[in-house]
Amino acid sequence: MTRLTGSALRLTVYVGENDTWHHRPLYSEIVHRAHAAGLAGASVFRGVEGFGASSIVHTTRLLSLSEDLPVAVVVVDTEERVRGFLPLLDELVTEGLVTLDPCEVVRYEGRRPS
């Protein structure tokens, strides 16, 4: 199990829920590549409302179309490992927003096998 404490870097990739990579959801491809690269972890968060570079507001509110909602893929690991992963995103993320933020890991514990 990867041990991670102290200073870290948070990578957040904002894309649309309908964005794809070879007929697979883009957010899923990013998670699987992060896993294959051995990063500490990745999570996908679905937004309920938002807009991006297109300036089109997407929402889940009743009586509104809930198409292509915003999705954030968040990865936290050491700065070296996260920065090493960035070139893998270049071919995947052609539209969207990619941000990096320093953070501090207070606890990182996985489930213990039964």
Curated annotation (Swiss-Prot):
Q: Which InterPro entries match?
A: N-reg_PII-like_a/b (IPR011322), N-reg_PII/ATP_PRibTrfase_C (IPR015867), UPF0166 (IPR003793)
Q: Which domain of life is it from?
A: Bacteria
Q: Which PANTHER family would you find in this protein's record?
A: UPF0166 PROTEIN TM_0021
The UniProt entry's sequence similarity note says: Belongs to the UPF0166 family.
Protein name as it appears in the record = UPF0166 protein SCO7045
Q: Which organism is it from?
A: Streptomyces coelicolor (strain ATCC BAA-471 / A3(2) / M145)
